[in-house]
Amino acid sequence: MATPFLKWAGGKSRLVPHIIAAAPQHIATYREPFVGAGAIFFALQVSGRIERAVLNDSNRELMDTFRQVRDNLEGVVAALELLAAAYLGAGPASRGEIYYAVRASCPATDAGRAARTIFL
């Protein structure tokens, strides 16, 4: 099963088996107005049931993150690697400080902002 690349409040990951069992075998256009982490979308997509998808959420930062992952995956991965190196290299005592510094940061690039969203 495909899993979302981030955690999101109100996520539907636990409901995926039930929703997939009740979903039609073919969905011409899947519309998700509250995508969150996208657990349902990813499960349906990997099952091959979706022909076209329209994803939305009221959280602009979240939607920008989805666009960056779709359109600039290499940039997002590079930015995440920098965050991971700083966080994991800091040691357990300093990781809280790193987390709060990342949370307070304002990355200059779209990929950097997407990486921050995923990291947090």
Describe the predicted segments one by one.
Residues M1-V35, A39-A43, G48:
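S-adenosyl-L-methionine
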